[in-house]
């Protein structure tokens, strides 16, 4: 744990001490209307761009379908209730 903390501290110290040049021309272009994109990479509008969507019943809980393979009947049970005897 101490080694990880020391490594993170060293990386931060190097990053803070590294000189950064100020590009005045780029700052002027960025402030004005420019054709630069807001982000450097394209983000897909939905999470599944190259594969089909997940199955509908339990898309967020795949473990539920694996651990509970009990079939659910579509109709009501045919046995009469105890009060109807």
Swiss-Prot record:
Annotated signal sequence is 1-17
Q: How is it modified after translation?
A: O-glycosylated with core 1 or possibly core 8 glycans.
Region O-glycosylated at one site: what ranges? 75-83
Q: What keyword terms does UniProt attach to this protein?
A: Glycoprotein, Secreted, Signal
The protein's matches in InterPro entries, at most eight in alphabetical order, are given as: FDC-SP
Q: Where in or outside the cell? A: Secreted
Q: Which domain of life is it from?
A: Eukaryota
The GO cellular component terms are: extracellular region
Q: In which tissues is it expressed?
A: Abundantly expressed in tonsil, lymph node, and trachea; strong expression in prostate; lower expression in thyroid, stomach, and colon.
What's this protein's function?
Answer: Can bind to the surface of B-lymphoma cells, but not T-lymphoma cells, consistent with a function as a secreted mediator acting upon B-cells.
What protein name is recorded for this chain?
Follicular dendritic cell secreted peptide
């Amino acid at each position: 744990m101490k080694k990880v903390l020391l490594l993170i501290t060293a990386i931060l110290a190097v990053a803070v001490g590294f000189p950064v040049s100020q590009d005045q021309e780029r700052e002027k272009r960025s402030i004005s209307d420019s054709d630069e994109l807001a982000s450097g990479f394209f983000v897909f509008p939905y999470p599944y761009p190259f594969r089909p969507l997940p199955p509908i019943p339990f898309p967020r809980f795949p473990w539920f379908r694996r651990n509970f393979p009990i079939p659910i009947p579509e109709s009501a049970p045919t046995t009469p209730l105890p009060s109807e005897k």
